[in-house]
């Protein structure tokens, strides 16, 4: 149990330094303007255009690799990226199991990680433990200790309510 965990629960975050690991899959958080401009991975862009992905707020599109395995995901931020700052909480409920990293986003990296952590919360005290869901690598540009403390505190407050 980490020093910031008040109630023992699985962490929604990948162990460090997962951000640079080859096993960590990218999430491109994009707006419709990013798709139009083609400002991210070419294969993911081609898949988004072929699938008609519009980057609506909270929309998710899984991107296959050439080998047919999962290669990443596109996450919509809505028009001009002006979305709710904690929209990444939806990623915690919609991404498949595995380790993920935010590859591109107009939302601050710490805000994306905090949103993901808060979205991963589940009250499970009287239930069977759920299977491990997706885990997010906290970006190096974000304050990991602060994010861990905040997610633990919010989780405790939710448990007490």
Please report, for each region that a protein language model flagged, where it lies by residue.
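N-terminal hydrophobic/helix-forming segments and targeting peptides
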Residues: 1-161
């Amino acid at each position: 149990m980490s020093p910031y965990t008040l109630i023992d629960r699985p962490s929604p975050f990948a162990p460090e330094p997962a951000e640079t690991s080859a096993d960590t899959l990218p999430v491109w958080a994009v707006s419709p303007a990013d798709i139009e401009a083609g400002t991210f991975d070419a294969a993911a862009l081609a898949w988004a255009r072929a699938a008609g992905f519009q980057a609506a707020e909270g929309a998710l599109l899984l991107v296959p690799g050439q080998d047919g395995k999962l290669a990443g995901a596109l996450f919509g931020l809505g028009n001009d990226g002006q979305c709710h700052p904690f929209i990444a909480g939806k990623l915690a409920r919609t991404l498949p199991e595995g380790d993920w990293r935010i590859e591109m986003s107009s939302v601050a990296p710490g805000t994306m990680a905090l949103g993901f952590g808060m979205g991963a919360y589940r009250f499970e005290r009287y239930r069977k433990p759920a299977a491990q869901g997706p885990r997010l690598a906290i970006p190096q540009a974000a304050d990991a200790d602060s994010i861990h403390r905040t997610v633990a505190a919010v989780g405790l407050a939710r448990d007490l309510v």
